[in-house]
Amino acid sequence: MTTEQLKQRTFKFGVRIVHAVEALPRTETARILGRPLLRAGTSVGANYRAAARARSRADFIAKLGIVEEECDEAAFWMELIVAVKLLKRARLASLCAEASELLAIVVASIKTARRSHRV
C-alpha cells in the first residue's frame, strides 16, 4: 500500500468515525464516550499525514507510534460503546475491523522502519 493510499484510507476511517459518533443516542453517556472516540479516530489520519511528512526516519517512527496509539484508542472506545449497548455490534463491526487492519499496517510499518533505521 502506498503512502497516498494509506492517507486516503485513514481519512476515510476518520469520516466513518464521525458518522458513527453522530449515530450515537443523544444521552450524556453517549456524549462522554463519543468525544474521545471522535478525537482518537479522526487523529489517526491527521497523524499519519504528519508521519508522511516526517523529517527523519526517527521522526517518522515516532509519529507512526502516535498513529498506533490513536488507532488502538479508537478501537477501545468502539468496544466500550458496544459493551454498554449504545450502538449495536453490527453497526460498528466493519469500523472495528478497519481499526484492526490499520493498526496491523502501522505496527508492521514501525517494525520495518526500525529495522531499516538500524542498518
Question: Which residues fall in each region the model found?
Answer:
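Short, C-terminally biased terminal segments at protein or domain edges
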Residues: 1-119
